[in-house]
């Protein structure tokens, strides 16, 4: 039996996908996000397009809101609003599970993940670590980062297998590429966004273009929004984002 109402707490990738699936099951759904936008890897102007899409499909989107109480059939927000909720789903991020690594005496890194080298070896050369609990190296600044994505875990698993077998291995750094579908929109992001670059005081500029998903002379082309962020001196690409009904994932 479907619940009569649902509240999703958290507006990241998992939260927005869960909200979509609840709506598809015809369950009235609210999504509560503490920041002023969904999907923090996006810059605000693209995140706004995602918010508009979600609201157009009936999601009660509560941005800039925090939860103060969860009851048997409701969720209370800090502003006093009470949302009906026969089911509450928490999608507020993940943290590395490092208890086993600590028990084994392995070194923990600056991001509170398992510290590894370029070949995913831990501080014990006989132990490798891959996946969400292992720190990665950011391709842009060379610092440790956490990127809980399946594709990256798969690639690092292959690095480990090759290294164990004595093959020549090229280290795999991360740029945090992710693609997600939310209702009729495809959303893609890679590299750093402007918020992060500004916070790190890294010079950058951005351009926006709105191409069609395919050649205009072929029917049913859909417009998309693409954003490219780059270093104004070197021209190095620092990040990119895209939102659209078709073609974004192929860019």
Regions found by a protein language model. Give the residues of each.
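General small-molecule cofactor/ligand-binding pocket signal
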Residues: 60-62, 128, 205-207
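FAD-site-proximal beta/loop scaffold in flavoenzymes
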Residues: 1-2, 74-76, 81-162
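Mid-to-C-terminal Rossmann-like scaffold of FAD/NAD(P)H-dependent oxidoreductases
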Residues: 133-248
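Rossmann-like dinucleotide-binding cores of NAD(P)H-dependent redox enzymes
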Residues: 3-8, 13-69, 147-153, 168-195
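Glycine/Thr-rich phosphate-binding loops of Rossmann-like dinucleotide-binding domains
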Residues: 17, 85, 98-99, 137, ...
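Short, hydrophobic/aromatic-rich segments at coil-to-beta transitions
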Residues: 71-74, 203-205
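A short, glycine/Asx- and small/polar-enriched loop/turn
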Residues: 70-73, 123-124, 219-224
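Short acidic-glycine loop/turn motifs at beta-strand connectors
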Residues: 71, 79, 231-234
